[in-house]
Amino acid sequence: MSTMTPLERTVAALTFKKPDRVPVILYFQSGVQHDVQELDYTWEEVLNHPRKLFQVVELQHTKYGADNFFLPVDFRVEGEALGSKLDYMLKCGGGMRMGVVSDWAVKTPSDVKKICIPDPTKAGRMPVILDVIRKLKKKYPDVPIAGFVNGPPDTVADVLEGRYKRLYVEMAKKSSFIHDLLELCTQTSIAFAKAMIEAGAGAIATVEGGMVDEAVSPDQYAEFVVPYHRKIRDAIGALGVPYIYHQCENATPFMDLIVDGIQPALVAFHDSVDLKWAKEKYGKKIAIAGNVSVSKSDAVLMFGTPEEVMAAAKKCIEIGMPGSGYWLSAGCEIHHGVPPENIKALVKAAALYGVYK
């Protein structure tokens, strides 16, 4: 089989056609601290400056060999655009931590109605993201770009004072303003997603980070998660763009709701999920990605050797590869502390073990 471009390879696997090899997809915070320090930037500079963000994101493909670009590389874009304030805390020896919310836009239920859907071409750091996507698309037309939107409940936690703790309480109380806030965050994500698509993104990825199995029930997931993600999925699906869904922690109790309710093109699994179970039960209905451990179990991507990473990746490839519909990826974000040599090992494993005959 002739060698495919990253775009051809990624689309083939997503649509259950046979690629030349398993694609390697990096997502969620795929800017590593090592590279930021090597470039002598702080995270505040990277996240607010188009040229510097471009330099860091570009390395996902040019340095590590991933089959995609992924941005934003932090989770606070929508929350900041909706009015929350960020601080960038210095950490001795570590450059700069990612931005953290220091002042929330919504303190009382009445605050929700004071906030308008932000214009992605003007609000916060959204224009920076759009500028970088346009530049990546122009320079690397054969490398797919995944634009990222926060899951609506996660954005709520970035704008609601009290974050998840208060969100869970308001959910239990069936507070109507939470649905109003979820709708505002959903429409913000839709507007941002459409702008990223117009700029050149070929897919929209999302994550559900706070609505995990240890915190919410399937009934709550069905009420507070599924309908809002489905609205995003439908909005971008109408443009012919796939929705890529990642559920943090153990997605097992929610999988039927995700597959049948949200209907994403692909689900990227955390390493808490049995990939063999997921492939056997859902692998003919949706494409899957995963799930080399980065945060739980042995966290091999974070703490293992390159050889251990390759061995773990080989096991995932052997499960996911048959019949196509599979991307090799980490079980959660390739965050900024992951050793560069381990990211390269993940990519190398696909070249050695993921070639289709």
Give the positions of each predicted feature.
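Active-site loop segments of alpha/beta catalytic cores
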Residues: 1-39, 43, 56, 67, ...
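Short, structured active-site "lid" loops
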Residues: 44-55, 62-64
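Glycine-rich, N-terminal phosphate-binding loop and its surrounding beta-alpha-beta segment
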Residues: 56-87
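Residues forming anionic-ligand binding surfaces in small-molecule and nucleic-acid pockets
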Residues: 106-113
